[in-house]
Every structure is written in structure tokens, then in C-alpha cells.
Design a protein with these regions (language model features):
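Beta-rich interaction/scaffold domains
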Residues: 1-64, 142
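Beta-propeller fold detector
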Residues: 47-58, 100-110, 138, 144-151, ...
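Conserved Ser/Thr-centered positions that define the repeating blades of beta-propeller domains
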Residues: 92-99, 136-137, 174-177, 229-230, ...
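Blade-level signature of beta-propeller repeat domains, shared across WD40, Kelch, NHL, RCC1
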Residues: 286-287, 292-320
Length: 320
């Protein structure tokens, strides 16, 4: 929005996703002509997201070849817990991933952590020990037992951790601290482990935030091809069969454009990409899938979205 006078500000840029006009005039004759400008890029690749050999960063470990690692967001920064190859643990934090400047130190925990269970929301971090005991921390120094035993942590929803607990041989949905969740027995086809990262969305069509998790491994040991959604109270199957059965995939927010009703501009809207993960035969999933309707339906991404040949074998990005 607004006007640009290129005689005065020759370095200004224009956002062509909206309606742009060019006004040409001759002051001497008090004549002007208005042109509507459009930028057509149909001869170019529609999506310039491409993988490059140099587009990588090393894990912020103290030693080489770490055994396990998981990174979450807490207090506006990335927090990474790393199990080193000598059995010690590193806690690394970074408030600017573009600068790739990590602060890291060896951390001694009063328990053996299940590194893959790490989850955080706002100012609180949750983690399970190797026996399933739940711990919390708000300062990354003091870990307090929550007095609960869980099978797994699915992720976080607003200010609480979401997971699964077991009682008398039955599995139930769990939440800490307890809010409005219906902590009923989980369905037989609900993934008990290996689901994707837990992502949250909210728009004008949702009365409360909705969290999604894709695929994973069910209690019977079989892998799931479903996407589950949680609205703060109940779980439902959002998509069934739209993805191949796998575990450890990653959900990543992305965006796309569609024409406005008038056709005069383009409107940006969010989409979800799913990449990585391991298939039932143990092979790495090399296909990137995309959902334009918040996880209800899934399609194979455009060729430019697919992994390049340089990432051969089993690339090391999958969620566990």
C-alpha cells in the first residue's frame, strides 16, 4: 500500500502480490495515464525452494558423532539436548539460528533421560526418564519430578504436555498440568510412539487451537498412515490413508498463494509439508508430501520440493 516516487527513492521495492499501478504523466499538459502492472513468472520455476549441498549446519555437540539429539523451542530460543558418544549429555541453546551461535555445556541430570521425549511450550520443558517418569523444568537447571509415569510424550498444547500413560494394562491420554483433555482410553489405531512432531494451527475457522500429529507406530507394532488432531479436549482422525505408513516424519509449515476473489492480487495461505521418516521396511522416506487444507488431504509435492540426489541413503533428519 502507499505510493512510491522513484525520483526520490530509487531503492524502494514493490510487493507484486497485491495490486500495483504505474502512473505516467506530463506536467506541462496536465496529462497522465495509469497502468496496472502484473508480473508473470510462468516461464520460471513456480517454487524456488531447493536443496543445496551447502544448506546444512552441524549439530551443536561438544564431541563428534553424537548418539541422540532433539531440539525444541523454549522462551524464544532453540534448546537442544544431545547424548554424546561417551555417554555424557550436552545442553545447547541458541537465540538466533541464522547466526548459528550456540551456547553449550555439559549437563548432569539426576536421571537417565529419554532424549526423544523432550518437549517444551512457553517457559516450561518436559522430559521422561528411561523408566517413563515425567520431569519438568523452567530454568533448564533444576528438573522437578511431576509424580507421573508416562509411556510417551506426544508434544505440547498451549501450556501443557500431551502424552500417553498406562494404568492396569490399559493406555490413556495424559496431560500435564491437567486442563480440559478427556483422558479416556486411547483407540487401538492411535500411535503410541514414533508420531511426527506435534504442530499447532489456528485460524478464523477454529474456535480453539488445533494440534496435529502424523503417522507413528500403533500399540500392535504396525505403522500408521493417519493424521490425528487434538482441539484441547478430544482427539479425532483428521486423515486416514492419505500418507504412507511410516514413523519419525517431520511436519513443517510452508506457504502457497491463491488469487483473490477480484483477481487483482494474490493471497498467501499456510500449507504443511511432511518429509523424512522411516517406512515399514526400514527404508528412509524420500518423498515430500504437502497438504493445502491443514492435514485433511495430502499430495506428493512438486518435483522442486523433492529431495535431491545428493542426499543419498538415509539422510539424518527424521523425528524420533
Amino acid at each position: 500500500t502507499g505510493e512510491i516516487d522513484y525520483e526520490k527513492t530509487q531503492t524502494d521495492s514493490i510487493d507484486f502480490t497485491g495490486e500495483v499501478t504505474l502512473t505516467l504523466g506530463i506536467k506541462k499538459f496536465d496529462v497522465e495515464k495509469v497502468y496496472r502492472l502484473k508480473v508473470n513468472v510462468h516461464k520460471e520455476e513456480p517454487d524456488l525452494l531447493a536443496w543445496d549441498e551447502m544448506a546444512f549446519a552441524a549439530l551443536p555437540s561438544r564431541l563428534g558423532s553424537p548418539l541422540r539429539q532433539k531440539t525444541v523451542e523454549m522462551k524464544g530460543m532453540a534448546v537442544s539436548l544431545i547424548e554424546e558418544n561417551d555417554g555424557t549429555y550436552t545442553l545447547a541453546t541458541c537465540d538466533n539460528l541464522y547466526a548459528d551461535t550456540w551456547k553449550k555445556h555439559q549437563i548432569t541430570l539426576p536421571f537417565k533421560p529419554d532424549t526423544g521425549s523432550l518437549a517444551a511450550s512457553g517457559t516450561t520443558l518436559w522430559i521422561l526418564d528411561d523408566a517413563g517418569n515425567l520431569y519438568t523444568t523452567t530454568d533448564l537447571e533444576t528438573f522437578t519430578p511431576a509424580g507421573e509415569k508416562w509411556l510417551s510424550i506426544t508434544g505440547t498444547y498451549l501450556d501443557s504436555a500431551i502424552g500417553i500413560r498406562e494404568e492396569e494394562g490399559k493406555r490413556y491420554f495424559a496431560q500435564h498440568p491437567v486442563r480440559d483433555m478427556n483422558q479416556c482410553e486411547i483407540p487401538a489405531d492411535f500411535p503410541v510412539s514414533g508420531a511426527s512432531n506435534f504442530v499447532t494451527l489456528q485460524n478464523k475457522w477454529t474456535s480453539s487451537p488445533v494440534a496435529l500429529a502424523a503417522c507413528g507406530r500403533k500399540a500392535d507394532g504396525k505403522m500408521s498412515d493417519s493424521v490425528w488432531a487434538f482441539d484441547g479436549k478430544e482427539w479425532i482422525i483428521l486423515s486416514n490413508g492419505g500418507l504412507p505408513a511410516m514413523e519419525g516424519a517431520s511436519l513443517i509449515p510452508y506457504y502457497n498463494y491463491r488469487p483473490s476473489h477480484s483477481g487483482n492480487s494474490m493471497i498467501e495461505y499456510g500449507v504443511w509439508m511432511l518429509l523424512g521418516g522411516r517406512m515399514a521396511d526400514g527404508s528412509f522416506n524420500r518423498t515430500i508430501y504437502i497438504s493445502y487444507d491443514n492435514g485433511v488431504t495430502w499430495h506428493k509435492g512438486d518435483s522442486k520440493l523433492q529431495l535431491p540426489d545428493i542426499l543419498l541413503g538415509n539422510p539424518h533428519f527424521w523425528c524420533k
